[in-house]
Amino acid sequence: MGNTAIAKKGSEVESVKEFLAKAKEDFLRKWENPPPSNAGLEDFERKKTLGTGSFGRVMLVKHKATEQYYAMKILDKQKVVKLKQIEHTLNEKRILQAVEFPFLVRLEYSFKDNSNLYMVMEYVPGGEMFSHLRRIGRFSEPHARFYAAQIVLTFEYLHSLDLIYRDLKPENLLIDHQGYIQVTDFGFAKRVKGRTWTLCGTPEYLAPEIILSKGYNKAVDWWALGVLIYEMAAGYPPFFADQPIQIYEKIVSGKVRFPSHFSSDLKDLLRNLLQVDLTKRFGNLKNGVSDIKTHKWFATTDWIAIYQRKVEAPFIPKFRGSGDTSNFDDYEEEEIRVSITEKCGKEFCEF
């Protein structure tokens, strides 16, 4: 590296520091003073279910006044309470309304009624990375690297705000109209300064320290990044089995096998991310994220250009118009029922 290149690297590191410092001020201001509810169910025309979960669903809706399309997440308060997800749900809304980053889905409105909580987010018509990955089989390394770079930058941003994401998987990554990623579902995200102990996440993506009920930190996100990059480039995750317990045994064993088509740089990066020993895992060492950003597999990545969305995406999803749902599966439609009496008012008073 010549002196000018070193100087450029130095100034880039400085400008990232400045950027993150300002981002933290912005975040803390919104985190401490979340704005009041700014809409109601009657403001939206419901179009179609985009996905369902254990305590709610996500629907495509159209804002009647502006005719804009949005994705509305509807959570049944009583089910949230039954499944002991109150804290997670309050976290999700409080975090989403306070963050701002090119690869994070934006929360536009939130409100509640007697029965449900509502989070209205920008609609990302390209659908889940999951469905594209399954259809194509696997992504080429440059294709996988394009997405991985966006996750690296997103985690660098979130971690600088003391946020752990904890739910990285292809189902939670939407592909937007420009072919870039939008991270969605902050249901497990949490603001943590030191360690935390909650068992949550998706079996294939859990870090060993979560499985072993150890206190864990943001390094679990870097482990999950390793799982994601492997799955994007292979077409299947590094640890899989029929039963979660068998998956956990494989994860904790620290043994990973790579497909023969993986480049040696990719294998090297993955060995450092899928590292059971926390004192050796990339992202968790004294250089932090720069061990990942300067790794050989990312040598061709222009981090600033990715952040500015100036790099041409390897794939643009096909869709017709802003309200097209052809990239999402079909689900059985169900009426939204709202009780005449308030449910769980106390539990969700801060929502």
UniProtKB/Swiss-Prot annotation:
UniProt cross-references to PROSITE patterns, sorted A to Z: AGC_KINASE_CTER, PROTEIN_KINASE_ATP, PROTEIN_KINASE_DOM, PROTEIN_KINASE_ST
Lipidation (N-myristoyl glycine): 2
Domain AGC-kinase C-terminal residues, every copy: 299-351
Sites of Phosphoserine modification: 11, 140, 322, 339
InterPro entries according to UniProt: AGC-kinase_C, Kinase-like_dom_sf, Prot_kinase_dom, Protein_kinase_ATP_BS, Ser/Thr_kinase_AS, STKc_PKA
Regulation: Activated by cAMP.
Catalytic reaction list: L-seryl-[protein] + ATP = O-phospho-L-seryl-[protein] + ADP + H(+); L-threonyl-[protein] + ATP = O-phospho-L-threonyl-[protein] + ADP + H(+)
Phosphothreonine modified-residue sites: 198
Bilayer disposition of the protein: Lipid-anchor
CC terms in the record's Gene Ontology section: cAMP-dependent protein kinase complex; centrosome; ciliary base; cytosol; nucleus; perinuclear region of cytoplasm; plasma membrane
Domain Protein kinase residue range list: 44-298
EC number: 2.7.11.11
Protein name from the UniProt record: cAMP-dependent protein kinase catalytic subunit beta
Record gene name: Prkacb
